[in-house]
Regions:
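Donor nucleotide-sugar binding/catalytic pocket of nucleotide-sugar-dependent glycosyltransferases
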Residues: 1-19, 24, 31
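Conserved acidic donor-binding segment of nucleotide-sugar-dependent glycosyltransferases
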Residues: 139-140, 144-151, 160-165
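Short hydrophobic beta-strand element within catalytic cores of glycosyltransferases
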Residues: 124-127
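A short, well-ordered alpha-helix in the C-terminal region of glycosyltransferases
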Residues: 166-180
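C-terminal alpha-helical cap of glycosyltransferases
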Residues: 183-210
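Short alpha-helical donor nucleotide-sugar binding micro-motif in glycosyltransferases
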Residues: 86-87, 94-99, 190
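Conserved donor-binding/catalytic core segment of Leloir-type glycosyltransferases
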Residues: 29-46, 52-57
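Aromatic "clamp/platform" in nucleotide-sugar-dependent glycosyltransferases that forms part
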Residues: 88, 107
Length: 210
């Protein structure tokens, strides 16, 4: 049995898309803070309200990229967060790369493409230790897998990343962890699996004839 994972566009999503002007716009008169963000659909099952544990921190600015039925409620519950709405294409790539930490809070993901896009952008990831994220994030190496509904664990993980003596190392490891998952590479892997299966079937048929 082989695991076939989705690919990611590592050219579109890249640390090179980090946008100083966008960071200045998001940070306002507090450029000393770090940007911590979520990208995805704003729906109840995504548990974005778990980010309330970070909202009152003075050293970060929360950024919420996306839209959905829970947006109005979340804007009330996270009044200091920056809600920038749905983004796509190059604009989305700039938002990813301009973050210092990406946090995903949904606990029931079969995969999580936004995590791959954040990693490709060279952004450390904090995500639930369940479902799809466990196949993407290497705990302590490219980010942290935790119970994101636990406010202590979430804050502690943010602190660990912000206090890294060489934060660029984790950013590089994040990028390198998905650099071989381009769509071309993963599609070729799938084709190779089909070829292997076809060859095994052909061999089995020839043995029956013999």
């Amino acid at each position: 049995m082989h695991l076939w994972q989705r690919g990611v566009d590592s050219v579109k999503f890249s640390p090179e898309k980090r946008d100083i002007d966008l960071r200045c716009e998001l940070l306002g008169d507090r450029p000393d803070r770090k940007l911590v963000g979520y990208v995805g659909r704003l729906a109840n099952e995504k548990r974005i309200d778990d980010l309330a544990a970070l909202e009152k921190r003075d050293d970060i600015q929360l950024v919420i990229v996306g839209d959905g039925p829970a947006r109005m409620r979340l804007e009330r519950e996270l009044p200091t967060a920056k809600f920038v709405g749905y983004q796509a294409g190059e604009d989305l790539a700039h938002y990813y790369a301009s973050l210092d930490i990406f946090v995903h809070t949904g606990k029931h993901e079969t995969f999580c493409q936004s995590i791959q896009e954040a990693l490709a952008s060279g952004v450390p990831v904090i995500a639930p230790n369940s479902g799809g994220p466990t196949d993407l994030v290497k705990h302590g190496w490219t980010g942290f897998l935790i119970d994101t509904s636990n406010s202590y664990s979430l804050n502690h993980s943010v602190d660990q990343i912000l206090k890294l003596s060489e934060p660029a190392l984790m950013a590089d490891r994040a990028r390198n962890s998905v650099i071989d998952r381009t769509w071309e590479i993963v599609n070729n892997q799938l084709l190779n699996h089909y070829r292997e299966l076809k060859n095994k079937q052909a061999l089995a048929e020839s043995e029956k004839v013999a």
